[in-house]
UniProtKB/Swiss-Prot annotation:
Lineage, top ranks: Bacteria, Pseudomonadati, Pseudomonadota, Gammaproteobacteria, Thiotrichales
Coiled-coil annotated residue ranges, if any: none
Gene3D superfamilies recorded: 3.10.20.590, HUPs, Isoleucyl-tRNA Synthetase, Domain 1
Gene: leuS
'HIGH' region (motif): residue ranges: 41-51
Principal location class: cytoplasm
Keyword Repeat in record: no
SUPFAM superfamilies: Anticodon-binding domain of a subclass of class I aminoacyl-tRNA synthetases, Nucleotidylyl transferase, ValRS/IleRS/LeuRS editing domain
Enzyme class label: ligase
Reactions catalysed according to its record: tRNA(Leu) + L-leucine + ATP = L-leucyl-tRNA(Leu) + AMP + diphosphate
Name this protein carries in UniProt: Leucine--tRNA ligase
Binding site for ATP: K578
Keyword Ligase applies: yes
């Protein structure tokens, strides 16, 4: 008997796929389409187990849908721009382009070795001119609509990487890659007006029925819509006003101070004549601006000489510069009510600022101790003059009316989200297609001149982008007046590329951004990726889709119908990482066990949404199962050569039992496939093989039927072995183009059933009975059974309770 030689099987199968162009998408608009997409990887150079799991999930779904007869699109590409490639290129003394393309070639070969069914004819790399040309074109359309703009902005500046960092990239005040202390710096930045779409992005979350609730909640919180009042505080002895937004106007009478951001114009103005304040502002520049960090870091402040007038009481209120107030949110100022806000309370305790209680609890029994903490619940107003005794709802309306009539405030809908800063001061990215002219200002490049090509012959250093030092790149004629001008040297944030790649896969060679194929394929039917992308990538992609819709490029409102967020791969309870020394190399596993084993383990060890704990024993177990599958085929290959057909009238009792188990497991597998519960689909495969092995006298026709069902369920998981056995057993040419098995409902109808017999609720017997018996007949048979009679003779049968074809309980006394 031949042994399972996974290496030969996988090589020959992959060669078959290559020769026959098996995975090329066939345009067939008569079929139902299914667009399956896994998030494109950054070409780091090698695959890790997280990649294997993520892309195996997508491949299983794509193969299953293809066997369901659908027209499947399953593409792959590369998120190729970005700082990591630039830094790696500097380190290895190569160009980023050369480094990236080399990594892509190797990773593509690794993908192929795992048997992924990607249509490589649609491959894109975001660093290719044919790709980024169209995002430059799109940016120009957005600029013409006023949706892209440039303004000075205070940013997180990494002095080592010489680029702007998002708030999320500042960790403990340091750059997430360089480790350098981050500085606050005001520089001109390009932005997209995502705030114009904030309401729609929020409302359309209701359309995302097949997205995880956790992701939807994160997006809702990130967009952060809130209704409140903007209150005007007049600066004493000045015509200026400080506006603050609050969702709790009921606490307005308890304002003890205003907090302003270190970058607030009033703070900067006073710092010119106050060296201590200037030092404090410099210190604030070195702290994190991430909200999570702001919540936990020490609250620090500096009392200014600025005073404001309370809009209702006319009291004089101090203004403090506070390290927890961000200039990028709202007006860069907050009203502080220490008695009713915990952060304000902590600040007041530190600087001995008095508290003024203006809310008491609805619960008279609740004792409020402001010496221990702030009272933050809504309640009844006290110490608030004419607003005393009002509850929150009535106080909100009364204070709104007063402020509006006095022109001291107005109702506002506020959003936590702010416009997306898309400028990066690095080389390895898509050039922003704008030109700066002294006379005309910022002018878009002429569309016929696109793409604005990224120069490849450059000398890279760690000190920022070399583009500003390349005369032939930077020195151009103004597209409007023809005078000498300067090209923009910033490049796009790499999230710009990854926000529309899914659409370009539908028409990767089109001589326009998107063509009519986009509306056939979009939206994506199944999108697979990590939950860590919940906010940035997934929100930006939703934003881009709406921008493309409004440009007439797509018709749908949302890019992704169904989102699956896979869990991490853990080892020893921790995420695999080089620093922890717990990395498992997928290539070593493929060499030792074969790609099919690696794929099957990654699907069987845990449901896709949960973290998977790495287990060498588990890998060995899945390999053992595949050897059993191979051995069953070897032992029974003579039977398959006979071209046997199933004849139901010739089935034995054992055949019928086996078919019931096989088709029950098939039914469960189909249900679990549709729910993406792949671990239980694999369990169903194992049960079917057990059924085939456990019955000694199965008819050959049942063996053929059962094993062909097993191979087709297993094929999306272990495509090499199933393809090989399908051909070896003369079941067909290519299992991928075979229809997925359907359940024979006749097989689920039992001739017999096992009845549990209880007497006074205690198990006494199990009887196998004819399924055609009526309730009365079942009762007669049971009461006549010799074993049962031994318990009820000389006893009075009070009643008989029968649960059809499951249980009968005889009550006696």
């Amino acid at each position: 008997m031949n042994e399972y030689n996974f290496s030969d099987i996988e090589k020959s199968t992959q060669e078959y796929w290559r020769k026959n162009d098996t995975f090329k998408t066939i345009e067939d608009n008569t079929k139902e389409k299914f667009y399956c997409l896994s998030m494109l990887p950054y070409p780091s150079g090698t695959l890790h187990m997280g990649h294997v799991r993520n892309y195996t999930i997508g491949d299983v779904i794509a193969r299953y849908q293809k066997m369901q007869g659908k027209n499947v699109l399953h593409p792959m590409g590369w998120d190729a721009f970005g700082l990591p490639a630039e830094n790696a290129a500097i380190k290895h003394k190569k160009s980023p382009y050369e480094w990236t393309k080399s990594n892509i070639a190797y990773m593509r070969s690794q993908f192929d070795s795992l048997g992924f069914s990607f249509d490589w004819s649609r491959e894109i790399a975001t660093c290719d001119e044919d790709y980024y040309k169209w995002e430059q074109w799109f940016f120009i359309q957005l600029y013409k609509k006023g949706l892209a703009y440039r303004k000075n902005s205070v940013v997180n500046w990494d002095p080592v990487d010489q680029t702007v960092l998002a708030n999320e990239q500042v960790v403990d005040g340091r750059g997430w890659r360089s480790g350098a202390l981050v500085e606050k710096k005001e520089i001109p930045q390009w932005f997209l007006k995502i705030t114009d779409y904030a309401d729609e992005l929020l409302q359309d979350i209701n359309k995302l029925d097949n997205w995880p609730e956790a992701v939807k909640t994160m997006q809702i919180n990130w967009i952060g819509k809130s209704k409140g009042l903007t209150v005007k505080f007049k600066v004493k002895d000045s015509n200026q006003e400080i506006e603050v937004f609050t969702t709790r106007p009921d606490t307005l009478m308890g304002v003890n101070y205003l907090g302003i951001a270190p970058e607030h114009p009033l703070a900067l103005k006073e710092a010119k004549s106050n060296s201590q304040l200037a030092e404090f502002i410099e210190e604030c520049k070195k702290t994190s601006t991430m909200e999570a960090d702001l919540a936990t870091q020490e609250k620090k402040g500096f009392k200014t000489s600025i005073k404001v007038i309370h809009p209702i009481s006319a009291e004089t209120i101090d203004v403090w510069v506070a390290n927890f107030v961000l200039m990028g949110y709202g007006s860069g100022a907050v009203m502080s009510v220490p008695a009713h806000d915990q952060r304000d309370w902590e600040f007041a305790q530190k600087y001995n600022i008095p508290l003024k209680q203006v809310i008491e609890s609805n619960d008279n029994k609740l004792k409020i101790d402001l010496e221990k903490q702030a009272f933050t619940e809504k309640g009844i107003l006290i110490n608030s003059g004419e607003f005393d005794s009002l509850n929150f709802k009535n106080a909100y309306q009364a204070i709104k009316k007063y402020l509006t009539e006095q022109n001291k405030g107005y109702e506002t809908t506020n959003f936590r989200i702010h416009d997306w800063g898309i400028s990066r001061q690095r080389y390895w990215g898509c050039p922003i297609p704008m030109i700066h002219c002294d006379d005309c200002g910022a002018v878009p490049e002429k569309e016929e001149n696109l793409p604005v090509r990224l120069p490849t012959d450059v000398a890279l250093t760690e000190a920022g982008s070399p583009l500003k030092d390349i005369p032939e790149f930077i020195n151009v004629a103004c597209p409007e007046c023809g005078k000498p001008a300067k090209r923009e040297t910033d490049t796009f944030d790499t999230f710009f590329e990854s926000s529309w790649y899914y659409a370009r896969y539908t028409c990767p060679t089109a001589n326009q951004m998107l063509d009519q194929e986009a509306n056939y394929w979009l939206p994506v039917d199944k999108y697979i990726g990590g939950i860590e992308h919940a906010i940035m990538h997934l929100l930006y992609a939703r934003f881009f889709h709406k921008l493309m819709r409004d440009q007439g490029l797509v018709k749908s409102d949302e890019p992704f119908k169904n989102l699956l967020t896979q869990g991490m791969v853990l080892k020893d309870g921790a995420k695999m990482s080089k620093s922890k020394g717990n990395i498992v190399d997928p290539q070593e596993l493929i060499d030792k066990y074969g790609a099919d084993t690696v794929r099957l383990f990654s699907m069987f060890a845990a449901p896709p949404e949960q973290s998977l704990e790495w287990s060498e024993t588990g890998v060995e177990g899945t390999n053992k199962f595949l050897r059993k599958v191979f051995n069953y085929a070897e032992l029974n290959k003579v039977i398959f050569a006979k071209n046997i057909t199933l004849e139901s009238q010739k089935l034995t009792k054992e055949d019928k039992k086996a078919r019931f188990e096989i088709h029950s497991n098939l039914k469960q597998a189909i249900f679990d496939f549709d729910k993406s519960q792949f671990n239980t689909v694999v369990s169903a495969c194992m049960k079917i093989l057990n059924t085939l092995n456990n019955y000694d006298n199965l008819s050959e026709s049942v063996k053929v039927e059962g094993f062909s069902i097993l191979l087709r369920i297993l094929a999306p998981f272990t495509p090499h072995l199933c393809h090989y056995l399908w051909q070896q057993l003369n079941l067909g040419e290519d299992i991928l183009h075979t229809s997925f098995p359907t359940v024979d409902n006749n097989a689920l109808e039992k001739d017999e059933f096992l009845l549990v017999v209880q007497i006074n609720g205690k198990l006494k017997a199990k009887l196998e009975l004819d399924a055609s018996l009526s309730s009365n007949q079942v009762e007669e048979v049971v009461l006549a059974d010799e074993h049962v009679k031994s318990f009820i003779d000389n006893k009075q049968v009070v009643k008989v309770i029968y649960v059809p074809q499951k249980l009968i309980n005889i009550v006696i006394k």
